[in-house]
């Protein structure tokens, strides 16, 4: 795998992240009956570039009592993991065609918890640490349901390879037979990426900023990029799992166009939800998962395991 292949994946992702921040501000603006950014460049299109220049040219301050090494490593790890998770995603051909691509993505999303924990702990601030603890508890909790939903979907697909899901869904989207799972998956991805109405770690309208409260300039920008890269990546994964695109081996570019449209629609849904819903209380957030989602997903998983056996067939083998 050459460095060019790597760059052709990473650079478009970072560009998409930059313009997603602009899209979010524009969408929120119009939903609140105002314009949003419209000064820098035509229709405010150069706003992300201005933001990036401002953030990366500021002096990266840090608290005097912070742990320097960990304080700097946490945002780097966050962005590195967010970009690594794009590798096994089929668009329609992945950067690295892994045999266990789904497990790799689960492992990487679990590792992302460490960057949050390190940033809160290394800041040597009680507010950052409390924010980090809340973020970690939320992320780990919702990973349980994400893993069970993934297992149920993979039982229908018959393989841990993401590319197989495209072939599985050529005739019918998995959204149709597994719509309860798809709904729970979408809500869990909102919680996993710390987005409204589950953004209790940041709580922009009440708290300061959560685990990254002590960060400024470049390191803060890295956290910001990682968060938005994760949002787009989760929507891309949702599309692969439940909204399998039209795939014609003679014209693979059609798949990519189809894929991009679906990811954009899901991302707009994320922004729409942020503009529409108030924040959950922390106990409601945990009750939703442990008392509602977990029993439901376990029951659905048992259903998808027992159905093929009851119908005297076996799960598909690849």
Swiss-Prot record:
Keyword match Acetylation: no
Q: Per the UniProt record, which EC number(s) apply here?
A: 7.1.1.2
Name a GO molecular-function annotation: NADH dehydrogenase (ubiquinone) activity
Query: Topology versus the membrane, per the UniProt entry?
Result: Multi-pass membrane protein
Q: Does the keyword Cell wall biogenesis/degradation apply?
A: no
Protein name per UniProt: NADH-ubiquinone oxidoreductase chain 1
- Which BP terms from GO are recorded? mitochondrial electron transport, NADH to ubiquinone; mitochondrial respiratory chain complex I assembly
Show the stretches that span the lipid bilayer. 3-23, 68-88, 100-120, 147-167, 172-192, 217-237, 253-273, 294-314
What does this protein do, in the record's words?
Core subunit of the mitochondrial membrane respiratory chain NADH dehydrogenase (Complex I) which catalyzes electron transfer from NADH through the respiratory chain, using ubiquinone as an electron acceptor. Essential for the catalytic activity and assembly of complex I.
Which of UniProt's keywords are assigned here? Electron transport, Membrane, Mitochondrion, Mitochondrion inner membrane, NAD, Respiratory chain, Translocase, Transmembrane, Transmembrane helix, Transport, Ubiquinone
Please give the catalytic activity noted in the UniProt record. a ubiquinone + NADH + 5 H(+)(in) = a ubiquinol + NAD(+) + 4 H(+)(out)
Name the domain of life this protein comes from.
Answer: Eukaryota
* Subunit structure of this chain's protein: Core subunit of respiratory chain NADH dehydrogenase (Complex I) which is composed of 45 different subunits.
Q: What's the main place this protein lives?
A: mitochondrion
Family, as annotated: Belongs to the complex I subunit 1 family.
Q: What class of enzyme is it?
A: translocase
Where found in the cell?
A: Mitochondrion inner membrane
* One Pfam family it belongs to: NADHdh
Organism of this sequence? Phataginus tetradactyla
User: What cellular-component terms does GO give this entry?
Assistant: mitochondrial inner membrane
């Amino acid at each position: 795998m050459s460095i060019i292949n790597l760059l052709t994946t990473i650079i478009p992702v970072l560009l998409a992240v930059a313009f997603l921040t602009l899209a979010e501000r524009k969408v929120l603006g119009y939903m609140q009956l105002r314009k949003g950014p419209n000064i820098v460049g035509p229709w405010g299109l150069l706003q992300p570039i201005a933001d990036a220049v401002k953030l990366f040219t500021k002096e990266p301050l840090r608290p005097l009592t912070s742990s320097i090494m960990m304080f700097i490593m946490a945002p780097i790890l966050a962005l590195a993991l967010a970009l690594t998770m794009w590798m096994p995603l089929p668009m329609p051909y992945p950067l690295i065609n892994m045999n266990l691509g789904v497990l790799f993505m689960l492992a990487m999303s679990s590792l992302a918890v460490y960057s949050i924990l390190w940033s809160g702990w290394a800041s040597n601030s009680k507010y950052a640490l409390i924010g980090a603890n809340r973020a970690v508890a939320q992320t780990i909790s919702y990973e349980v349901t994400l893993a069970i939903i993934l297992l149920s979907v993979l039982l229908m697909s018959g393989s841990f390879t993401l590319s197989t899901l495209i072939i599985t869904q050529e005739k019918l989207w998995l959204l149709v037979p597994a719509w309860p799972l798809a709904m729970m998956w979408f809500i869990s991805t909102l919680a996993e990426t710390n987005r409204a109405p589950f953004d209790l770690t940041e709580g922009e309208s009440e708290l300061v900023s959560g685990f990254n409260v002590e960060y400024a300039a470049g390191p803060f920008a890295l956290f910001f990029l990682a968060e938005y890269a994760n949002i787009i990546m989760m929507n891309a994964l949702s599309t692969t799992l439940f909204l399998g695109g039209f795939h014609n081996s003679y014209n693979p570019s059609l798949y990519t166009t189809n894929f991009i449209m679906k990811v954009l629609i899901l991302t707009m849904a994320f922004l729409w939800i942020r503009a529409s819903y108030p924040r959950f209380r922390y106990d409601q957030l945990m009750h939703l998962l442990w008392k509602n989602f977990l029993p439901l997903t376990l029951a659905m998983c048992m259903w998808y395991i027992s159905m093929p056996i009851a119908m005297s067939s076996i799960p598909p083998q690849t």
